[in-house]
Structures are given as structure tokens and as C-alpha cells.
């Protein structure tokens, strides 16, 4: 199984974001040991001072493909959810300044949180992400319809397979993760909690 994370197209224009200055979408691959499912605890690592969770809609692919045209993208996934990419933000800024690869800051065990998968037509317009005293709203917006371009970009270079996950549009801003809190992703229209993780 492969896991891909993709920044949002406007991430580079967000002041204070660890992605500030990016001129286009950036993608990176995460090892399968990074997967952390809803209900499992997240233990804050000790190799950096600050960790933040960056929400994203997650697509689960359902078939093999390469060089997939955007118009065929809907044939290649069967379910979606919300997830979060955990990033060592200070370390990422340092690595970017030094022109080094991002992997130490973005690809480590249990850094990819995923919620319960639902059918694509069940995806609401937005989600509320809460952790401790911090919260933000993740607008799904045009990500569902724009997924074809993202899948086309990835599959141009890499063969995708059934079970692969794509975090298709990381929020430009994250939520700090502090021990003793919980990270929850909620549909406020019906109070459905799609992701809930204890931070330890």
C-alpha cells in the first residue's frame, strides 16, 4: 500500500504555514507504517519540539492504474474519509530553508491519521476539526471534483493500486497536538465524528 499527501494549491500563499512559498501543489509519499486509524492513540514523538495535524480529505483507490486521465478518476476510488497528516512543522521549515528533503519532518510512524471511510456521495460540504482549545473548518469545496487532476499527476509517474490512499489537499494551516487532548473531526450538521484520536 502506498500513501500520498498533496498540499493544497493555495498553501504557498498562507502566511505562517510550513508550506509558505510553494508555487504549486507539492506531493510526498508516506510509508505504510505511518497509518493510524481512528480510535488508536497518537503518541507525540520526541525528535522535534512542535507537531501539528493538517487535515485533508482522503481517497481510497479501488483499482490498478497508470496514466489515468482526469475524466476517469471517479472509476478509481470507492470510498473517502477525513484524515490528518502530522508534521513536525519547525523541522520542516528548517529542512526547506536548507534545501533538504522533507522526509524527516513528514514521513514517520503513525503520522497519517485516517477516519472511518464513507461513500463519496456521503461527504458533506465541510468538517470541523477540534483539538484542545484549537479548532478550524475544513471546506471540502471543489476537492471532490478536482481530484481527477491530482490522480492524473500522481499516476503519470507511479502505478497506483487498490488500497492506496491519497490525502488530496492538506490544509495550509494545522492544529497543534498537545498531550492530554483529543483530535476530532466532526460533521456539525449531524454531529457525526468521523475521526477521533487521543493525543498522548
Spans of model-derived segments:
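Catalytic-core "active-site belt" of small-molecule-metabolizing enzymes
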Residues: 1-165, 172-200
Amino acid at each position: 500500500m502506498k500513501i500520498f499527501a498533496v498540499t493544497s494549491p493555495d498553501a504557498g500563499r498562507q502566511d505562517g504555514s510550513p508550506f509558505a512559498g510553494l508555487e504549486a501543489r507539492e506531493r510526498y509519499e508516506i510509508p505504510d507504517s505511518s497509518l493510524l486509524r481512528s480510535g488508536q492513540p497518537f503518541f507525540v514523538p520526541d525528535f522535534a519540539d512542535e507537531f501539528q495535524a493538517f487535515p485533508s480529505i482522503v481517497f481510497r483507490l479501488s483499482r490498478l492504474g497508470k496514466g489515468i486521465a482526469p475524466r476517469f478518476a471517479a472509476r478509481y476510488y470507492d470510498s473517502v474519509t477525513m484524515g490528518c497528516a502530522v508534521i513536525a512543522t519547525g523541522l520542516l521549515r528548517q529542512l526547506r530553508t536548507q534545501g533538504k528533503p522533507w522526509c524527516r519532518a513528514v514521513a514517520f510512524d503513525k503520522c497519517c491519521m485516517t477516519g472511518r471511510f464513507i461513500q463519496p456521495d456521503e461527504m458533506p460540504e465541510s468538517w470541523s476539526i477540534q483539538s484542545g482549545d484549537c479548532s478550524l473548518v475544513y471546506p471540502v469545496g471543489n476537492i471532490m471534483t478536482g481530484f481527477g487532476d491530482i490522480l492524473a499527476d500522481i499516476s503519470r509517474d507511479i502505478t497506483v493500486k487498490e488500497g492506496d490512499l491519497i490525502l488530496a489537499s492538506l490544509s495550509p494551516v494545522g492544529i497543534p497536538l498537545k498531550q492530554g487532548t483529543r483530535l476530532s473531526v466532526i460533521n456539525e450538521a449531524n454531529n457525526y465524528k468521523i475521526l477521533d484520536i487521543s493525543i498522548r
